[in-house]
Structures are given as structure tokens and as C-alpha cells.
Swiss-Prot record:
Record's function text: Binds directly to 16S ribosomal RNA.
Polar residues: bias regions: 1-10
Gene: rpsT
A Pfam family that the UniProt record links to this protein: Ribosomal_S20p
Name the record gives this protein: Small ribosomal subunit protein bS20
Keyword RNA-binding: yes
Source species, domain of life: Bacteria
Region (Disordered), start-end ranges: 1-25
Xref: InterPro entries: Ribosomal_bS20 (IPR002583), Ribosomal_bS20_sf (IPR036510)
Family: Belongs to the bacterial ribosomal protein bS20 family.
Example GO biological process: translation
Keyword annotations: Ribonucleoprotein, Ribosomal protein, RNA-binding, rRNA-binding
GO molecular function annotations of the record: small ribosomal subunit rRNA binding; structural constituent of ribosome
Length: 90
């Protein structure tokens, strides 16, 4: 246990931020899962709309420091490529 008041406060803040960050990360993963499910179902329109929403959530998470910007770019790029491949198959 921390002995200084400032350290105790810092620990409380860390725990609070940890819960918030976990929630945000889980929310982003949910949006990514929606995109993946739409791609697997072969529904291009739904996948594109889901990707747009997921991209927004990912960008916000990157701004908050939950994901690095390169990670966000990589995820969006890979999902966009999969959606493009759906178009090519049709």
C-alpha cells in the first residue's frame, strides 16, 4: 500500500482510467466484430456502413491513447481490403 497521499490518489486515478480504457477498448472490438461478421456474411453494404462506424470509434480511441495510430491504420486498411475483395467477387 502506498504511504503518501499523492501516491494513493495516483493509484485511484490509475484504477479509474484502467476501467474506462477497458470499456472503450471493448466497445471498439464490438464495432470491429460487426464489420467482420458483415464481411463473412458477404453483405458489402452493411460491411461498409459498419466499417465507417468502426473507423470513427478507432480514431477516437487513438486520440485517447488506447490504440496507437499505426494500429488503427492497419486495422482499417485490412478491413477495407476485405470489403474491396467482396466487391471483386460480386
Amino acid at each position: 500500500m502506498a504511504n503518501h497521499k499523492s501516491t494513493q490518489k495516483s493509484i485511484r486515478q490509475d484504477q479509474k482510467r484502467n476501467l474506462i480504457n477497458k470499456s472503450r477498448k471493448s466497445n471498439v472490438k464490438t464495432f470491429l466484430k460487426r464489420v467482420t461478421l458483415a464481411i463473412n456474411a458477404g453483405d458489402k453494404k452493411v460491411a461498409s456502413e459498419a466499417l465507417s462506424a468502426a473507423h470513427s470509434k478507432l480514431a477516437k480511441a487513438a486520440n485517447k491513447g488506447i490504440f496507437k495510430l499505426n494500429t488503427v491504420s492497419r486495422k482499417v486498411s485490412r478491413l477495407s481490403r476485405k470489403i474491396k475483395q467482396l466487391e471483386d467477387k460480386i
